[in-house]
Structure formats: C-alpha cells, structure tokens
C-alpha cells in the first residue's frame, strides 16, 4: 500500500486516537515529546534500520520503551507467501478435508517447501517469522476485540456481510459508510467452507479467525456474526437483533449454491440498500495483483530483512559473550 492508503487504514483501527503522518523510521525522543507520548510500544521482533542498528535504541536507553509479545501465528511475510502461492493450507479444514489428510500430507509439505524456496530464497528464514504457527483464537482474545455493546431500543441496526478476506482499506471505507446508515453496525463474516463453495478452493487466504478479528478491530463495527450464512435469512434479521437495514456495496453479487440472490429476502422486505463509497480503488484483486507484479521486489526485500535480523542477533550474542 502507498502511504496515503496506510494512513487511512490505521485511522480505521478502533484503538488509534491520532495518526502521525510521515513519521521517522527511527523513533526519537523529540517526536515522542512533540505528540505527548510517554512511552513507545513495539513487539518483541527486532526492528533494524538501514544502518543495521535497532530503530528503538534511543527510546530504550531513555527508559521509555515497552515491549509486547508478538501475536503468535500472525506474519506479514507468511501472508504475502500465501498470496504468491495461493495456498489454502492455512484455512480451517472441513470434514471432507480431514478425510483426505493422508493424501494431502505430501502436497502440504511441498507447499511449505515452496514458500521458503520461492519467497525467502536460499537465505535462512527470519528468526521472528520462520515456522509461524496457525493463528489460534481464544475467548479471551475475542473479548479483547469486542465492544461488548448492545443496541439501544431505538437504535437503527444495520447488517452487512462478506468474507472480508485480506482485510483492507476498501473494507474500512465500506464499513464506515454502512455505519452512517444507522446507529449499530452488525457484520456477518462467512466461514472458510462457505467462501470456498462460492469462490473456489483457493479461497479464502485468511482463516475465519483472522478475518473476524480484523473486522472487530474496525472502529465502525459494533458486533460480528461469526460464520454467518451466505444468504441473509429470517434468523439473521430477527434472532440476533432486529435488523432495520441490510446493505451491500456496488460490486456484483455472486449467487448462492442454489443460484439464488443471497439478498432476496431483505429486498422483498424493502430493507435492502446499496452503498456508494468514495473508494480508494483497493480490492482483494488489486492487492493480489500488486503482490504478484512486485514478486521479485518482495523476495529481495525479504532476503535483506532476514540478513539484517540475523546479523543483529549475532552481534548481540558476541557482545554478551565478551561481557
């Protein structure tokens, strides 16, 4: 994404209060003081600048740095690898998939091998992203993302649904406009099997857990229906909350497995509405196209990143040995 797209994506996060545009890559005390920041927080993966040094060393030396654990199973590098390889081994297996585990084992090994050879190249993998496990969601994690907010009796409840794969700025813009239609935004997220039936066996690239938490992180979303049906049903409209409006964007709607319009019921009830968004132009397809067309650049960037991380760790180890 370009810088403008990244600024707006971060603004869409419900935990963000202010975005500092054109921030320096190496965090300084001056920039922290300018924006009234007491501490700087970063994950436990090492961030290396062009000079090979820790980009947070200044704030660490000043005692104003806080480290948090990197979320297990979440890796930009791995996600890019998924896009390049269109692998589906990250998705949750269905009963049918499980019965074919033995036959699939060798192909899974080959796919993982291809991730290393085709994306990371011959260099060693990053110590922070190598062997990334599947992202596992706990009830505690969901509660951390949830608003725990119920609609008020007079609130106008809006329902939208989708796969929200590769959650991006286009999704954020759509959700922002949907929220403007009422007071409470309820979002249905389809499960992996449903998406595969509609879009094909290589979809989605993100698992249901990843997609649900991505949507819950949006500041415009109040609640999520996990594993929502592809076609909007009476249960969706009445049993969770009383839905006043069902909305969808201007993109084409794929028919359900019975070749029916998934929005047939809300259209018949007169509560369906199309949302026009001032789109950034970002879609699932444009992201894939960007990644694939810049494949060589991503591979080279990854090799350099790995080399820097390994060099920094080696230097730190040598320093400790001397002490």
Descriptions of predicted regions:
Residues 1-323:
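Nucleotidyltransferase catalytic core that binds NTPs
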